[in-house]
């Protein structure tokens, strides 16, 4: 059983980035649920746990401790960017092993397709808590810029959030070689 830990960024009293009438915490939760549902409905041999399934406050250490204790095989942290840019980028901890880079490559490649027409900002490294304190391969994604109108308009469309979530799931499925269910839901 492959164990996937999905971490929708922010939540509760931490809205994350805010812009164009959107809150990061709401978008990350929607994307995470689409990712979870796609994995569970379409693949066998996979188990999913989420750091939160509603709008509640969860500390960074609670997220990583939960994933470590559960024995997750992969940790995927979903975020929305801010700061006036545009497009998609992904992060891993600096100098990680090839396995984590392969997971990043698989997810990045699928999500970039969901963001067609947007800038691919590249595969990056960062010393983020959720990448540093996890004991399994961990990838953090930044899915568009909430404070850029073009990106925000894209993120306001529920079908696009679904596409992004499903792309995350496809990347994970590809990396782990998950078996498709005979009758996907």
Name every feature range the model reports, one short phrase each.
Residues 2-3, 26-185:
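Active-site-proximal helix/loop segments of hydrolytic enzymes
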Residues 4-16:
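Short, surface-exposed beta-strand segments enriched in small/polar/acidic residues
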Residues 16-30:
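Glycine- and acidic-residue-enriched helix-capping/strand-helix junction motifs
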């Amino acid at each position: 059983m492959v164990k996937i830990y999905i971490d929708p960024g922010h939540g509760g009293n931490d809205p994350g980035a805010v812009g164009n009438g959107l809150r990061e915490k709401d978008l990350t939760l929607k994307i995470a649920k689409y990712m979870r549902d796609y994995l569970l409905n379409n693949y066998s041999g996979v188990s999913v746990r989420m750091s939160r399934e509603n709008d509640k406050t969860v500390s960074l250490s609670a997220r990583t401790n939960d994933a470590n204790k559960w024995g997750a095989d992969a940790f995927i942290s979903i975020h929305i960017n801010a700061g006036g840019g545009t497009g998609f980028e992904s992060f891993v901890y600096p100098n990680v092993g090839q396995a984590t880079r392969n997971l990043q490559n698989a997810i990045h490649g699928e999500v970039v397709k969901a963001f067609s027409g947007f800038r691919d900002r590249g595969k990056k490294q960062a010393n983020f808590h959720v990448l540093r304190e996890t004991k399994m391969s961990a990838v953090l994604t930044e899915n568009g810029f909430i404070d850029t109108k073009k990106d925000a308009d894209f993120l306001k469309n529920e079908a696009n959030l679904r596409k992004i979530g499903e792309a995350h799931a496809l990347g994970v499925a590809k990396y782990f070689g998950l078996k498709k269910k005979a009758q996907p839901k």
